[in-house]
């Protein structure tokens, strides 16, 4: 795409300015309120490992709840060196998420032109899945970046005729090493990415057939050298846990499978919108642009093969929760940049057609056309509610399990939970002026109603840990240890911790029976005995109804806060 028909030259500095603006927007969305985010859901998988196991034990076990071996080991060492907090658990994903905003647009700017790269940069900057996974202590943002780096590196190494005759030995070795390391590390971080990063090798083997006979042997040897190096690196980190604990992976298979509703729902996840019209518009633009992407970027071809192989693996093995669109969308997360790149290419192609003949009004309309997919996805974005202040629950699964409210299973779940008027009454106070520690905390978010409490109260809600107060150990609670320095949770047994984190109230959720769709389950029965301990520690409640008990927390030099009544 030359961009000659557009109102601004394809080489205009304007497009670099747009890419710079996209970087700022993307950085803002990924860093907004990140320091106050509560650790939730699958983010706890690695924590449960490194607080009870040594690195050598983690190296030999993928775990039933896939915690990502290298992240678990890294977190263990961070705990020993300088202590772990929510931010230290998330920084690798944040770094990779921010790097993606730079690396991918720059990579496509050459073959597709700056206008397409600029629109692409804006689209990935505001992609809800890319934003959410960049903020999450799970490996998806890392494997997405490593996966596409592997594909790009392979193209520089590719044992084709041009590479054999014109590539420099040093450059090819560097490209091959980059591919091998990126592919092995991505697979170690999240084994399901394996087929995606292996796809370039399969594609390359087929390419060897097209090399002239005189060069075919050299091409095959170069391919074999990279395949052996990549296989050896991958085997060195994947085989030990696979052989030591083969059931850790096998036990997660044959449980669920994607169905028609799953395959429909993933498009809303990948495009990041609840609006069917927006999904259809983006699909139309992607269909218009994908042929250009396919021709111009070889990594798009190997990437498409990798995505197909990954989907076939998931469909064949039936991992747990694979009937949910959110699960398939993250297993195939590398498709998001590819789809958005096709949308960007289709948008620029459409704009070029509109700009001919190149009259002033047509060129202006062409420029506006290029903003259409960005505007449509921004207006319908599920990220908007997450920008509310304060909001410490942005990583809660309710926000992204399904962007369509009528398909979100958390909506009826939370509607069935008891809700005290205490939360809405707190809204009379200035937003963010009160901090509440709520207990019992459930790291599996389907039992943690804090997003609704924060939305109604406009105040900050953090987990109140019962460990050391009335229980010895609970899943989803950190032990009282100087190595574990969570900023967005508080030990209720520790008066100094309550004071340091500015807790005004402790809200105790009374046990209840949750009835959803005819299924009943007791919630809180395992910690019911803690109520008496809390009453003894904090004294008379500041508020109590049939659902919750609220205790005021006095601090030195500050009187106890008064709860709304």
Where are these regions (language model features)?
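Membrane-interfacial, low-structure loops and terminal tails that flank and connect transmembrane helices
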Residues: 1-12, 159-173, 210-220, 352-364
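Alpha-helix C-cap/termination motif
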Residues: 110-111, 353, 357, 429, ...
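Extracytoplasmic
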Residues: 382-565
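Membrane-proximal helix-loop-helix interfaces that form the catalytic/acceptor-binding platform
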Residues: 18, 23-161, 172-352, 377-399
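Hydrophobic C-terminal alpha-helix "anchor/cap" residues
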Residues: 2-4, 78, 186, 426, ...
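Start-transfer (signal-anchor) and selected internal transmembrane alpha helices
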Residues: 1-28, 109, 297, 364-371
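Internal/C-terminal transmembrane anchor helices
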Residues: 362-386
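Glycine-rich, flexible loop segments associated with nucleotide phosphate handling
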Residues: 16, 167-178, 215-223, 327-331, ...
């Amino acid at each position: 795409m030359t961009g000659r028909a557009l109102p601004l030259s394809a080489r205009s500095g304007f497009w670099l300015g747009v890419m710079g603006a996209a970087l700022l927007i993307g950085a803002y969305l990924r860093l907004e309120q990140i320091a106050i985010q509560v650790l939730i859901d699958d983010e706890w998988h690695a924590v449960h490992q490194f607080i009870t196991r040594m690195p050598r034990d983690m190296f030999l076990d993928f775990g039933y709840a896939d915690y990502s071996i290298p992240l678990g080991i890294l977190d263990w060492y961070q705990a020993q060196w300088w202590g772990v907090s929510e931010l230290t658990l998330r920084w690798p994903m944040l770094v990779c998420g921010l790097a993606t905003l730079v690396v991918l647009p720059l990579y496509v700017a050459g073959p597709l032109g700056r206008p397409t790269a600029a629109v692409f940069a804006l689209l990935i900057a505001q992609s809800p899945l890319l934003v959410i996974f960049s903020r999450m202590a799970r490996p998806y943002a890392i494997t997405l970046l490593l996966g596409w780096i592997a594909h790009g590196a392979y193209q520089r190494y590719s044992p084709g005729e041009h590479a054999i005759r014109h590539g420099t030995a040093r450059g090819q070795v560097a490209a091959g090493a980059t591919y091998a390391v990126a592919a092995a590390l991505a697979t170690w971080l999240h084994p399901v990415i394996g087929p995606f990063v292996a796809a370039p090798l399969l594609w390359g083997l087929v390419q060897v057939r097209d090399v002239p006979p005189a060069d075919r042997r050299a091409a095959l040897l170069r391919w074999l050298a990279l395949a052996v190096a990549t296989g050896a690196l991958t085997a060195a980190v994947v085989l030990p846990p696979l052989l030591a604990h083969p059931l850790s992976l096998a036990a997660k298979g044959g449980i669920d499978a994607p169905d028609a509703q799953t395959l429909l729902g993933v498009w809303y996840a990948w495009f990041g919108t609840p609006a069917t019209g927006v999904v259809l518009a983006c699909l139309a633009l992607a269909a218009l642009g994908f042929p250009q992407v396919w021709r111009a970027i070889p990594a798009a071809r190997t990437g498409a093969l990798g995505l197909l192989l990954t989907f076939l693996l998931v469909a064949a093995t039936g991992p747990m929760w694979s009937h949910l669109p959110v699960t398939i969308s993250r297993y195939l997360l590398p498709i998001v940049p590819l789809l958005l790149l096709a949308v960007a290419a289709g948008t620029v192609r459409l704009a070029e057609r509109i700009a001919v003949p190149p009259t002033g009004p047509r060129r202006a309309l062409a420029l506006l056309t290029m903003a259409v997919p960005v505007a449509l996805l921004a207006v319908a974005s599920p990220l908007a509610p997450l920008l509310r202040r304060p909001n410490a629950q942005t990583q809660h699964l309710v926000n992204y399990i399904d962007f369509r409210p009528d398909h979100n299973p958390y909506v009826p779940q939370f509607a069935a939970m008891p809700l005290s008027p205490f939360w809405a009454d707190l809204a009379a106070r200035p937003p963010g002026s009160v901090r509440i520690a709520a207990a019992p905390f459930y790291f599996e978010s389907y039992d943690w109603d804090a997003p609704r409490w924060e939305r109604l109260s406009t105040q900050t809600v953090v987990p109140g840990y019962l460990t050391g107060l009335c229980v010895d150990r609970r899943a989803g609670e950190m032990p009282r240890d100087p190595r574990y320095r969570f900023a967005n949770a508080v030990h209720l047994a520790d008066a100094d911790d309550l004071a340091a984190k500015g807790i005004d109230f402790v809200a105790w959720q009374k046990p209840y029976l949750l009835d959803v769709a005819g299924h009943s389950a007791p919630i809180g029965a395992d910690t019911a005995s803690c109520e008496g301990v809390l009453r003894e520690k904090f004294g008379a409640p500041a508020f109590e109804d049939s659902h919750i008990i609220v205790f005021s927390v006095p601090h030195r030099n500050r009187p106890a806060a008064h709860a709304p009544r």
